Amino acid sequence: MASNARNLTAGDATARHPAAEPVAERPPDVGTADAGRPATVRPEERTTDERPAERTEEGTEERTDGAGAPLPAGSDGLTAAFAAPARIPLPDASGPRDAPTRLIAHGCWYPSADPSGTRLAFICDRGGVPQLWTGPADGEPVRLLDDGPDPVREVSWSPDGRWIAYTTAPGGGEHTRVLCVRPDGSDRQILAGAEPGSSAHLGCWAHDGSAVTVTVAVPTGPPAPPSPSGADTAAGDGPSGPGRGFGLDLGSGLSDGRLPDRWRGRAGETELLGPAPHTDRGPALPSPAVTVGTTPIGAPGGTLPGGTLPGGTGFGDGLSAYLIDPDAVAAPVLIAAVQDAATLRVCDLSRDGSLALLRRGPRGRREAVVLRTADHVTTCVLPVADGDPWIGSFSPRADALRLRSNAHREFAVLLTAELDPDGRPLGWSTVAAREGSDLELLRYTRDGATAVLAWNIRGMSDVEILDPDTDTGTDTDGRPEEGTGSASRHISLPHEVVTRVTDANSRLALALSGSRRRPGIWWLPDGATPVRTPWSSRDEDAVPPGRPPVRPVPLRPTARDGLPLNGWYYRAPGRAPGEPAPCVIHLHGGPEDQERPVLDPLYHEILGRGLDIFAPDVRGSSGYGRSFVDADLGRGRFAALDDVADCTAHAVLAGPADPSRLAVMGRSYGGYLTFASLVWHPDLFRTGVAVCGMSDLATFFEGTEPWIAQSAAHKYGHPERDRELLRELSPMTRIDALRAPVFAVHGEHDTNVPPRESEQFVRAARERGVPAELLTLREEGHDFLRADNRRLFRRAAADWLQRHLNS
């Protein structure tokens, strides 16, 4: 491995950092300091042969880090880091250049450029499933690099141009693997995530391209025994192989709320997490403290903590972040390890490898952590915003840190801090902020000089470029409303929403979506004017000829308690302006997602049946400030259910929706809201379509992935301490009120919201004489990624809605 990676563990920590302080007490808003102590793995030059496990004096096999060093025990008695992932070579799976296009109306997204900026790796579904492709930014041909059936999720081209790393979701499920392949399609290999029950997530590359960071998730407890009813097959037999069933009894009614044994936490009382931890400024932190304005945001000196819930009850997976050499010249290097964690991602490494920028924590409680890699001392912790996981980066000399953060603010801004030689912040400044708008994407060019910012303005994107002379910051207490001044440049976008920004040497590449086109990739050859890549589908090919996509109009409902709401109304073509029409209220997932004005083939199908669509953002949605996101926490969820009814009333009073022909529909959390709305407001809707929705929050916690449970406990309530609240919020509790027919859809490999949630609601509806049907999609997880299944789903849903609303 090159010197960049070796520097992570080379030398004596005290010699390199003479000013290093002893481990300090953790501030009260960032968790427990000793929950999952990281272990250092010293890389050794070796051949591709793995070293065998060593034997202890007692004769038992000792787990090692992959380089022969024993793994230290964590403070809770569990191993702090799990065995390093083993590299698995795979056969060449690249396709021919410019393979025949199966789907004309295809999407391209998630671009990553080679060092020259002339070629892009990207994800494209022209073959019917998201796959890894590469091609020149300004021409043809393109090439398929992995023709396997597993959907691709993320892509990253190495800084030296020799490798392309990417993640796949075997079986379409929630567990992912990290792979690498040469740009010509050779040397394809699995880097992590092949072990049964594990999952792997892609991080950043070392800046010299010698290694890539990967987070490996390993269950902290043994899987439950298979259920005799076969629930283990429905919940988890897919992506990571058999053996990760959840032991659920599909024949039971309401759950007793007991957690599986693998979620039993350490001693201590559990509690519902209250308001967002970053809203309550709390007591002053012990000195020295890093502050934004007058608000303490973290203290240096502590080791990396785990992600446990208050009171010591944790039920996340064990997460270990490694630096892995795809050439297999050096052993994996452990960067950090935590237990009972929701997330852990390495977002950046300093050029010399001495500092790592980590993102950790459940949604609503994300944090940026600066870690010294030599001694695993935390030098800075700062709350950061949800959304895009790539939260920021170091400057080229690691003398500054740039972050997308909403620490003690309603909206995310660009913050920078000067760093001392040990990685401690010397002070913070606000570089860019906008009143009422979130900074949702942040990218610095590879030379670290230019920042590209994407702002979310009521669901629409605005892209701003900060040149080097403008990146000087404003006063810490300042709240600039329009960036940093007239020197910043704005990019005129051909479509409404930017989903990704990547630098392409001296140029940029943007992934765009819009209300009238499929996702595509644009590049900026002159740095100012986006040009569509030739292999992205044309606007006119977005839908079949004859019926163009509908551009939505914004609506602004008001909740019964006075809270302003937002949404987008789609009018079915061919109707007079004031003509009452059947209307589908469509609810997004999250709950922190946001309805964006982008083309959805499902909407296009429904609109073609003569049905209007109103897609609101009820409380809990992102894009309108942190207070709005947190407005549905705990018992605030009841107000979110009222928001659905209030938005429906607004669609009738302010729009052309026919009050006698209304339906409710949603996916994931939106599926939960659909189930709940049908039993909370049984006379409001004629029918409902729930997609991958929760019907009983107790059984949801029993069956979901541990890291998802970590985040969900913050949003809905803790499954032990708040059992009664979860029972009140569960649609199954009020199933006797159901009147309207319901259509449920679920992916067979969904381990986010297991299929049991749809099965038990449909079964209960039928037992009460209410028409109900369930569509289970094969080889799909929580997201439907295969073209044939997506087509089946949207046609079946539209058929159901048309039948019940036009009868």
In which residue ranges do the predicted regions lie?
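Intrinsically disordered, low-complexity segments used as extracellular stalks/linkers
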Residues: 11, 16, 20-26, 30-31, ...
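Peripheral, non-catalytic segments that deliver or gate enzyme domains
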Residues: 2-18, 22-25, 65-111, 115-135, ...
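Alpha/beta-hydrolase fold active-site loops
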Residues: 582
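Active-site proximal helix/loop that lines the substrate pocket
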Residues: 589-592, 620
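Structural cue for short, hydrophobic secondary-structure segments
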Residues: 586-589, 615
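A fold-wide structural signal in alpha/beta-hydrolase
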Residues: 607-617, 773
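Active-site-proximal cap/loop segments of hydrolase catalytic domains
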Residues: 618-807
